[in-house]
UniProtKB/Swiss-Prot annotation:
Residues 1-70 are annotated as: Disordered. Residues 25-53 have a biased composition (Low complexity). This is WD repeat-containing protein wdr-5.1. Contributes to histone modification. May position the N-terminus of histone H3 for efficient trimethylation at 'Lys-4'. Required for di- and trimethylation, particularly for the trimethylation at 'Lys-4' of histone H3. Not required for demethylation of histone H3 'Lys-27'. H3 'Lys-4' methylation represents a specific tag for epigenetic transcriptional activation, germline establishment, maintenance and function. Implicated in the epigenetic inheritance of lifespan over several generations. Component of the SET2 complex (also known as the SET1/COMPASS complex), which contains at least set-2, swd-2.1, cfp-1, rbbp-5, wdr-5.1, dpy-30 and ash-2. Within the complex, interacts with cfp-1, ash-2, dpy-30 and hda-1. Interacts with histone H3 both unmethylated and methylated at 'Lys-4'. Interacts with jmjd-3.1, ceh-6, sox-2, sem-4 and egl-27. Interacts with set-2.
Length: 376
């Protein structure tokens, strides 16, 4: 079985509504999309990860010309530095809410915590027996939860590197995870087709949702933790009531391609969903309508993360199987920049909560994390 990679990919105009700092349209949008693959894609990274310990992490000063801006748009991200240390594919990269740290997970079975001030690896968290597919931060930036092919999740305390809980219950690869905003619950999705909700204090599963008919690729809480979005290879995005575990909405488009990633917008009114037909869609989930679709990248095999950037320009950001990171104008759907520098598909990406910084991570044999900065 493969191990660690996750995702995203992306309709039209008339901006009117404010989403926190994001303005999005309320008119549905059309757009053609490539046919969905005939079979469910493979999990996500190299199989049978070895236990080879990662070498000491380093920060390297890269060629500033590695990032290329498009002729249109105003994004001007440039490669700031490269972080090395993981020995296998990078599956996810997440900035801490405080912005001081970057957490990365890998098929090498480890989670690394990088200090963003000094661009060094401060801690390597170990304990999983197989590759790690995803991580998430608690709201106070004190803990991370990790999801692994070993069918478990683990909660680590960052200051001490201590593993405080192991969450057991899934009977197949655990592919995705997230804390609720209160950091009292963890939600997880698995290849066993279920979504589970866990009590952080006790480490016990308090709800098991028979969520989908294929592997669950992504889970996301909304801004107050009252709702959970889940995406699956069955082509559905489902919205769940956290308190009672009931499905309150199912989003599906006409062609029903596998869903590789889902994420609530900052104000919780919209959902960004990536499909394995090389599209990213922005949904008004209350109306069950697609508002915008973003295309131009390649995404037919892996689960690739996608992001809202709100610190400078209002962008949608995603990795791609052509080894690049794509940046779209949220409103116009135009590709405003394409970042080049990785040598393998880019599954992991995240946007810094305060600064105009993007982190990206690639599959092996690249295994590198690039840090990009913009002054716009």
């Amino acid at each position: 079985m493969d191990t660690s990679e996750n995702a995203a990919s992306a309709a039209e105009q008339q901006p009117t509504q404010q989403i926190d700092q994001l303005t999005v349209p309320n008119a549905p949008d059309g757009g053609s999309s490539a046919p969905a693959p005939s079979t469910s894609p493979n999990s996500i990274s190299p199989s049978n990860p070895t236990g080879t310990p990662a070498p000491g992490a380093s920060a390297q000063t890269p060629n500033p010309n590695a990032a290329g801006a498009s002729a249109s748009g105003s994004a001007n991200y440039k490669l700031m530095c490269t972080l090395e240390g993981h020995t296998k594919s990078i599956s996810s990269a997440k900035f801490s809410p405080c912005g001081k740290y970057l957490g990365t997970s890998s098929a090498d079975k480890t989670v690394k915590i990088w200090n963003m001030d000094h661009m060094i690896c401060e801690r390597t968290l170990t304990g999983h027996k197989l590759g790690v597919n995803d991580i998430a931060w608690s709201s106070d930036s004190r803990c991370v939860v990790s999801a692994s092919d070993d069918k478990t999740l683990k909660i680590f305390e960052i200051v001490t590197s201590r593993m405080t809980k192991t969450l057991k219950g899934h009977n197949n690869y655990v592919f995705c995870c997230n804390f609720n905003p209160q950091s009292s619950l963890v939600v997880s999705g698995s290849f066993d087709e279920s979504v589970r909700i866990w009590d952080v204090k006790t480490g016990m599963c308090i709800k098991t949702l028979p969520a989908h008919s294929d592997p669950v690729s992504a889970v996301s809480f909304n801004r107050d933790g009252s709702l959970i979005a889940s995406g699956s290879y069955d082509g559905l995005v489902r919205i769940w009531d956290t308190a009672n575990g009931q499905c309150i909405k199912t989003l599906v488009d006409d062609e029903n391609p596998p869903v590789a990633f889902v994420k609530f917008s900052p104000n919780g009114k919209y959902i960004l969903a990536s499909n394995l037909d090389s599209t990213l869609k922005l949904w008004d989930f209350s109306k069950g309508k697609t508002l915008k679709q973003y295309t131009g990248h390649e995404n037919s095999k892996y689960c690739i993360f996608a992001n809202f950037s709100v610190t400078g320009g209002k962008w949608i950001i995603s990795g791609s199987e052509d080894c690049k990171i794509y940046i779209w104008n949220l409103q116009t759907r135009e590709i405003v920049q394409c970042l080049e520098g990785h040598t393998q598909p880019v599954l992991a990406s995240d946007c810094h909560p305060v600064q105009n910084i993007i982190a990206s991570g690639a599959l092996e044999p690249d295994n590198k994390i690039h840090i990009w900065r913009s002054d716009v």
